[in-house]
Amino acid sequence: MKNVAVIGAGTMGNGIAHTFAQSGFRVQLIDVSENALKKGLETITKNLDRMVSKETITEAQKKETLSNITTFTNITEGVEYASLVVEAATENIDLKLKIFKQLDEACPEGIILATNTSSISITQIASVTSRPDHVIGMHFMNPVPIMKLVEIIRGYNTSDEVTKTIMDLSKTLGKIPVEVNDYPGFVANRILMPMLNESIETLYNGVAGVFEIDTVMKLGMAHPMGPLQLADFIGLDVCLSILNVMYEGFKNPKYAPCPLLVNMVCAGKLGIKSGEGFYDYSESRKAEKIAKQFQ
């Protein structure tokens, strides 16, 4: 397995492509948008430059990593030689089902189809394919080149052989794979998202401000960043999508998204990606200035 196709050139997609390419795999990075592919490659290059400056890789290794990546806007062309496809599109069930139908038609029998979904049922995604035994969850953490964990989620029909292959493959990437069961949110987001949502509720209810909430969690709980800063980093739209999946999946009110989160997403305040969330990122990507709405 030396050829890997990655669907989606956004934050997770380009991070996954970077990780595979740096580990010596030939990567076909696929996105319907030429602009997204351009931005994805720029992000990969910037991250590699940072690694060179920190002397964690050499200039030659940077060039080799970039040479391992080829871009495509056509799924059929992009997956032609792939032994594994990793889908990393937006966390939207309808979009993912559409992509997996396309992949099932375009990929030869025996090719493993993985999804980077952070909350959606692997069994449901696999149901639109003719190879549910070859569909698996491979949930990387952001930023992918740095974070060690990969949640490996087997659907109802995922085979033992495919699961072992992906577990072993994750280790060759320098990751630590953890196998979890196919329930909404899996492990990482089932625990993380209610905490972020409760932090937003705390702000919404006027218990404390942005600075105070994040400071309590950073200094009191030794978290590297506060929950509101983390929500901005993940993307408030992503947080909302995951909470909606969990709320629909469990029908438990504890997963219901805070009205403030819903309103912010509707207003286009998505965090770092949009330039504003709980913090203002118009001058810096660092959470140094609280957004005007919350001052």
Predicted region positions:
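Acidic/polar active-site rim loop that often engages polyanionic ligands
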Residues: F25, P143-I152, H223-M225, N244
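Helix N-cap / loop-to-helix initiation motif
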Residues: S33, T58, S159, A208-E212
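Hydrophobic/aromatic beta-strand patches that form the interior of the parallel beta-sheet core
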Residues: Q28, T70-F72, V86, I136, ...
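NAD(P)-dependent Rossmann-like dehydrogenase/reductase catalytic/cofactor-binding core
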Residues: K2, S23, K164, K171-D182, ...
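Rossmann-like NAD(P)-binding element
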Residues: A36, T56-I112, I120
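NAD(P)+-binding Rossmann beta1-loop-alpha1 motif at the extreme N-terminus of oxidoreductases
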Residues: M1-R50, K54, A106
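Rossmann-fold dinucleotide-binding core
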Residues: I112-D182, F186-R190
